[in-house]
Structure formats: structure tokens, C-alpha cells
């Protein structure tokens, strides 16, 4: 094949490395404005890093030629080292095998069995917030949403409430995220005997013990529930007939657990942040949520709550939790007439693509009335694209469409004075440090 020698424009290594010390999503956005859809960033002694901002180029890497761009970049290897070799982080044949195992557990029909659990926990939060509203107590939304989605995920996974174990569950995840998000070029191995690494090791052992205890406990009553752990315990390899090993289950659960609650919890917190900045949308959201009968959740809610869905879509557009998707070029390629070297690191950025002025009018504006129908899967992909598209997308959307109407049926809110919300862009995009709101019952 003929290859072009045309080289994409981009910053020098010094400017690039300095930019990584600040707000990286906004830095990538500034690089897009300055250098265009394909940005080349040199790294001494290594193949270059490319930032892709155009939806077509991102689709090329994640979907059309996905086999040429495996998850073998250094960020993905860090994720695997921290969270195990489950379907979220595995590569190659191991990933294909585990993804095939886990896919049925996240299909719509299977998830319907969990609706009553999600409904119960959403209503429990409403009752808790009613008490706080009556007492005029502030609510810290970031931690509240993280705790709610953690509770939901663990009940869906294990039929088990983690409320008394939240710190033990969250602490190793927090330390792992800090390690994964260490900026280039600080290539610090997790196995180096640093105080942080030792702390992660011991905290991670605690989490593994919690998971192993749940697996051992549930082995005694296989088939008694319809949750994900029961699904994994009942699984038999279609060729060998062998069940999953405990280690394989542990690896899967270690990756699904943090990915499942951190992302959805952050999306809910971003929704409150955006509505707090644009309070003119709260009344319309309240009105729509109260117009629908307070019945058990079903997929029909997606059609009966269009403005609510628009608020969620806009939140995921502006603050996609998977804001950068990393791959490695296994072979030389060409993108937009630019040569892509073998071994190059490819960063596909939904954060910048969702703000691309060629596809989005007033891209920085929060507009729940946007028409997303023509953008789905092409210029809008908060859950990724291609074969590695987020396996938990259906569960995340069900949680969002259950929690948001439940809360805004009962409450309006205002944001209280506090520190300015910033973006924590390590691994997923989360608001930090906190967001305090004052609730008012309707």
C-alpha cells in the first residue's frame, strides 16, 4: 500500500508536557483549535502520540480498523495492572473471551430483573433527602451520587449492600486512579516500593478479600438469585464445560466494580453541576418528571421523558466520563492523509469531538432540546465506539433514567457557595472537590 509521508502538526515536546500539568481536557481542546483534527505530539525515544478530534478519525481507530489499534498503550497497561484482567481492561483473545462471557449479563432482558433493586435504592435516597430538605441541611452531591451508584452496582452484581464497606471498596480504587492518571512522562511502576504503592497493595488486598468472601458465600446458593455474580457462577465454557475459575471471576469483578459506579456517579454529579449553572432548565425538568405517573420503571420511560433524556444526553456530551480513549497502532496507517507510525499512541477524545464546531452548534452551551437523533453513534459516543464500546451502557442509562426523574419529581435545588468545581481527569472525568446544594421539596 502507498503511504503518505505527510506529518500532522502539533506542539513540541516541552509545550506538550507542560500542558499535561494542567487541565488536560481543555488543553486537548486548545490543541484542536490550534492544530486541527489530527494533532501530533512527539515523545523522545518513543513513537509519537496522536490526539484525534474528528468523529470520522475516531471511528476509524475504535471501530472500522479496531484490530489495528489494540489497547496496548501505556495507560491501558496501567489500568490492567491496577484493576486486573477483566473484560474492561483485557486485550486480545483474553478480552474477546471475557467479553463474550459477560455480554449477556448486560442485555436489556437481563437488566429488567434488577429494576426493583434500582427503584428501591432511588426511593430510599428520596426519603433521606426529604429529611435533609426539611432540616435545611446541605447535600454534597458528588459523594451522594457516588455512594448511590456504588450501592446500586453492588446489589445488581452481588445482591449485597456495601454501605458498611464503602471506604474499603473506594480506597483502593482512589489510589489506583491516582497511579493510572500520573502524567507523562512519569513512568512509575506500581511494583516500585513507594509508600503509595505499599498503601495500594494493602488496600487492594482488602477489596479482594471482600470480593472473595462474596464469591464463596454465593457458591453455597447458586441459582437462588438473578444477579451478575450468580450468572458468572453458573457459566460453563461451551467447549470444555468447565466453569469460570475464582481468579477469573475476581479479575472480572475488580474491573466492573469501579468502572460501573464511578462513571455513572460522576455523570449524575455533572448533571447537577450543569443545572446549577443553568437553573432555567430545572423548572421544566421538574414539570416533566411530575407529569409522568410514579409507577415502576420500564423502558417506556425513555419515550415519555424526552426533556429528562435531553438533560442526560447533554451532560454526557459535555462531560463524557470516558473523555479520552487510548489505543496503540500495531501497524503503520494513514488518517486524513497523515502518516501514523507503527507503535504510535492514539488518543481518541470524545471531549473534543463532542465540541467539534462542524457538528455541534454552540458546542459549549448546555441545551437539553438538541436533536440528538442524527448524531447517535456518529458524532456522539459517550460510551465509546466499536467492539470495545462500554458493556455497561444499558445499565448506566437505566440508572440515569431512573434516578433523575425520581429526584426531580420531588425536589428543586440551588447551588450553595463553595470552591469552584474543577475537572478530575484521571481515568474518568469527575467533578472535584465537592458540590453542595440546598434542596427544596416540591
Where are the regions that the model predicts?
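Cytochrome P450 fold signature focused on the C-terminal beta-domain
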Residues: 222-226, 286-305, 318-338, 353, ...
